[in-house]
UniProtKB/Swiss-Prot annotation:
Its cofactor is FMN. CDD domains: OYE_like_FMN (cd02933). The keyword Cytoplasm does not apply. GO terms for biological process: jasmonic acid biosynthetic process; oxylipin biosynthetic process. Substrate binds at H177, G178, A179, N180, R270. This is Putative 12-oxophytodienoate reductase 5. Belongs to the NADH:flavin oxidoreductase/NADH oxidase family. FMN binds at P30, M31, T32, A63, Q105, R229, G300, G321, R322. Putative oxophytodienoate reductase that may be involved in the biosynthesis or metabolism of oxylipin signaling molecules. Signal peptide: none annotated. InterPro entries: Aldolase_TIM (IPR013785), OxRdtase_FMN_N (IPR001155), Oye-like (IPR045247). It holds the Pfam family Oxidored_FMN. The lineage of its organism: Eukaryota, Viridiplantae, Streptophyta, Embryophyta, Tracheophyta.
């Protein structure tokens, strides 16, 4: 048995004066799984999340829509109707029975959508009418419609109400999705925002919408229940900024205005390949130093890198995506330095309620049963 005290990822973490009190620092990263039929969370999600829940752990849900215009992928969950809230309740209860904290990620895709996903076949909404350039994947996103200034308060209110609904469903807090090229980032980054009004142009103006969402959600449920995910360095869905350091720093300044803000969850720059090995860029340190609360790092971490960044104080917590997807008992495997199941890309976004979802084996089930990587 490995001495847990020697493994930084498995050391406890207690937020000073806050609600995060963890037995380890291995978090489940938010990952879209496309298995919430008709946007309604399903009973099989309770098994998926509880498989990955441990006493003193922290899980973040898959991205969860705040309204009927927030959709851009098949069968993703929502939290904007009474039906959604009631469907989430038993899932949240099941995670809590395992002793874990559960955070709901609130999401609006903006232009990462097609007319088919939108009410009455209308155009997706965004900061601008700039269409995402086709990337060869076969997906062609529809040309978006630029939001009018007088429409923006309604979108802000959608986030506020979704946050209230998430708390009613029993979640311990929410994570505002301000990353990965979705609506908030479409406003924040200069490549996707060509507005000339108070929501475009300067850095402050481009961040205005995101700040209004943060302020509204904090006002509704309290800063101690609100986290955010940001990815200033990423170039995802044609969403890139000419000065990511300034963008990240400005947003951290805004978060610091809310005393007791739950956490700041940031995505590393794209991994580089050095001498044939993946190498994380480690670009988040200035933001980590500037942010006054709990900091979470994400982006391609493994056991070795995760331990390293906890040990040297680069971050408080590390979120794991694909490794946790394929290894429901990931903290235990890290503890024992056990072999990991390989994830199967082919089943990331399929709608099967079992295959590639809840059928990845636990260590004590079958030591040798690994799912082939695609």
């Amino acid at each position: 048995m490995v001495n847990q005290a020697a493994m930084p990822l498995l050391t406890p973490y207690k937020q000073a004066g806050g609600k995060i009190d963890l037995s380890h620092r291995v978090l489940l990263s938010p990952m879209t799984r496309c298995r919430s039929y008709g946007n309604v969370p399903q009973p099989h999600a309770a098994l998926y999340y509880t498989q990955r829940a441990t006493s003193g752990g922290l899980l973040i849900t898959e991205a969860t829509g705040v309204s009927d215009t927030a959709q851009g992928y098949p069968e993703t969950p929502g939290v904007w109707t009474r039906e959604h809230v009631e469907a989430w309740k038993p899932i949240v209860d099941a995670v809590h029975r395992k002793g874990a904290l559960f955070i709901c990620q609130l999401w609006h895709v903006g232009r990462v959508s097609t007319n088919d996903y939108q009410p009455n076949g209308q155009a997706p909404i965004s900061s601008s009418d700039i269409q995402i350039t086709p990337d060869g994947s076969g997906i062609v996103y529809s040309k978006p419609r630029r939001l009018r200034v007088d429409e923006i308060p309604q979108i802000v209110d959608d986030f506020r109400l979704a946050a209230r609904n998430a708390i009613e469903a029993g979640f311990d807090g929410v994570e505002i999705h301000g990353a990965n090229g979705y609506l908030l980032e479409q406003f924040m980054k200069d490549s996707s925002n060509d507005r000339t009004d108070e929501y475009g142009g300067s850095l402050e103006n481009r961040c205005r919408f995101a700040v209004e969402v943060i302020d509204a959600v904090v006002g509704e449920i309290g800063a101690h229940r609100v986290g955010i995910r940001l990815s200033p360095f990423l170039d995802f869905m044609d969403c890139v900024d000419s000065d990511p350091e300034a963008l990240g720093s400005y947003m951290v300044e805004q978060l610091n205005k809310h005393e007791g803000f739950l956490y700041c969850h940031m995505v590393e720059p794209r991994m580089a390949i050095v001498d044939g090995r993946r190498q994380i860029q480690h670009g988040l340190l200035p933001f980590r130093k500037a942010f006054k609360g709990t900091f979470i790092a994400a982006g391609g971490y493994d056991r070795e890198e995760g331990n390293k960044v906890i040990e040297n104080g680069y971050t408080d917590l590390v979120s794991f995506g694909r490794l946790f997807l394929a290894n429901p008992d990931l903290p235990k495997r890290f503890e024992l330095d056990a072999p990991l199941n390989k994830y199967d890309r082919n089943t990331f976004y399929t709608q099967d309620p079992i295959v590639g979802y809840t059928d990845y084996p636990f260590l004590d089930e079958d030591q040798n049963n690994s799912v082939a990587d695609a």
